[in-house]
């Protein structure tokens, strides 16, 4: 019987002390199931430390390890897209480079996909062992994804997931320079499930995911997958117009009933500031969409590969 292959994609950034441990844990985990072959695609996301040399040593020691070295830091999701382009497995898994993803539970994560019950399985952590800022960012992304993508409220995204080959094939068709991989997986199939598990404490290095990055990721989600913010702008504009109309009628009636009362300067300024602020916010939303359309038209790349190791055919320098 021909072995099925699992491709593991690891975005790497500032992880010279942990990524080799993650790779070894993958080897040990797959060794438990000899009916599966595997490959490991590690993507150096322009890391400032010595992680590339660590990965090159892994390539020299193990032909199943592939490495992409990106010329510019584009973030985790761009690194994942680069890695997905060179995977050859029947199943594609993604995990972090910091030893926090519980690889000892990988076969539990794999089970619903392996048995045909789902096309994508994502780890759902009971309580994430992260900083309050990162947890807040995760919560913001979860709420935003539920509203923008139509994601069920009880479905949670995380960095530890596995998907079928056809889902990966659909994901890499996306050419926008601002990918949101979790949304792309959910867009490719509605058969997405969570597998409950507990993540590990961080024992090596420190996290680099900030609230700002979470908000940036949410912006990628709503400008790439939904026009709801534009519709919201219409609703807010109509509401402001209605409030202004009612206020205008009230002002006229009040003036007729109380002709000696001077018009209130402070209330007028408050209304002007409110409406001016709303107009700027709505123009900002529209501008964000237009700006990304402009960038897309100019063929801005998702990622740029400086060099690759043990990869038969590296992805195009610019994904177009």
Where are these regions (language model features)?
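Residues in soluble alpha-helical coiled-coils and helical-bundle/repeat scaffolds
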Residues: 14-17, 100, 104, 172, ...
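Hydrophobic helical membrane-anchoring modules
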Residues: 2, 180-320
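Short conserved micro-motifs on helix faces and helix-strand junctions that flank
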Residues: 11, 70-72, 116, 161, ...
